[in-house]
Design a protein with these regions (language model features):
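Membrane-proximal interfacial segments on either side of biological membranes
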Residues: 1-120, 124-132, 144-189
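Short, glycine-rich nucleotide/cofactor-binding loops
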Residues: 138-140
Length: 189
């Protein structure tokens, strides 16, 4: 990897480009005097990055940006935002079985072993003691939209999410059949 380090009496920063878990990743770490550090990751393979960081092995591929604001000096408590594009959720039979009921394309990707594919994903997280609290989690694909909030405990390997799942194709058909709904939602005439 390649790194640049900057230090003065107000700020310390590290910027770098290297491989994290085999994924080319840009990293930026900043620490201002009298404040907690921030960290940014940008990668073309978010699955490999999340695996290397010890978060999950269940994401495959995907461009990903992770912005972290630490909330203590021990780096154990932080909030952040994760944005991802073009990724799959794999090896999660409970989630896959639930989603396959709503989406024919989901069934097709499960049979081929690719998991559930999403075009976009976004999550706001709060992490403390290996417990992730999601106050906003959005996932979307051509056929499926998910909005949720809840908790993920890495030590107990448990997840508790509440939210909604919508078959996007069905919503699109309803909007196209009833133009007034489309105008109401978009404001366009």
């Amino acid at each position: 990897g390649k790194f640049d380090i900057y230090v003065d009496n107000k700020i310390s920063s590290l910027k770098g480009l290297g491989l994290v878990g085999g994924a080319e990743t840009k990293i930026m770490l900043k620490k201002r005097i009298n404040s907690f550090p921030t960290m940014v990751f940008k990668t073309s393979n978010g699955g490999k990055l999340l695996n290397a960081l010890g978060f999950t092995k269940n994401i495959k591929s995907g461009e990903m940006d992770i912005n972290i604001n630490f909330l203590d000096n021990d780096y154990n408590y932080y909030k952040g935002q994760i944005k991802s594009k073009k990724f799959s959720v794999v090896n999660t039979p409970g989630i896959i079985n639930s989603l396959s009921v709503l989406s024919f394309s989901g069934i097709r990707s499960i049979i081929s072993g690719e998991g559930v594919y999403f075009e976009k994903g976004e999550a706001n997280i709060y992490v403390k003691n290996k417990t992730f609290k999601f106050d906003k989690l959005y996932l979307s694909s051509d056929s499926l939209g998910i909005a949720a909030k809840g908790r993920l405990n890495l030590e107990k390997k448990s997840i508790d999410l509440k939210g909604s799942v919508a078959p996007i194709k069905l919503i699109s058909r309803i909007i196209s059949v009833v133009p007034a709904i489309g105008e109401l939602l978009t404001g366009l005439k």
